[in-house]
């Protein structure tokens, strides 16, 4: 009985150690933009990251991909970005303060690829 209780406690502890990592990966943010979430199912490509800090503002390029539809990704950002202070502009552009965010969603087949670009307004 004591052994069964210890094994149960160990299993529950292990579940709590693993669960936060899975939740974090599923609801992650871009590595270089801590307030720009990744749509569910997307994983950032570390090789695509480029960041420059300039006196006039930052320039960030990033990409993510996943087995999701382009429509689901577009809907996610259309619903999420306004709550983060971004205002939709023509095409794929969003504006917040002195920055412009561009989202390019490409689906030539699985996976969908999303390219993020943040630059100062001109």
Predicted ranges, named:
Residues 2-6, 22-122:
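An acidic-aromatic pocket/loop used at catalytic or ligand-binding sites
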Residues 9-19:
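Bacterial N-terminal signal peptides
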């Amino acid at each position: 009985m004591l052994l069964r209780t210890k094994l149960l406690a160990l299993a529950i502890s292990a579940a709590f150690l693993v669960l936060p990592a899975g939740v974090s990966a599923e609801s992650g943010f871009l590595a270089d933009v801590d307030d720009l979430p990744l749509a569910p199912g997307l994983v950032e490509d570390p090789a695509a990251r480029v960041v420059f800090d300039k006196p006039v503002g930052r320039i960030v390029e990033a990409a993510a991909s996943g087995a999701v539809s382009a429509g689901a990704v577009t809907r996610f950002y259309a619903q999420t970005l306004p709550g983060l202070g971004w205002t939709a502009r023509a095409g794929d552009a969003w504006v917040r303060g002195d920055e412009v965010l561009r989202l390019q969603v490409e689906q030539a087949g699985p996976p969908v690829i999303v390219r993020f670009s943040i630059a100062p307004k001109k």
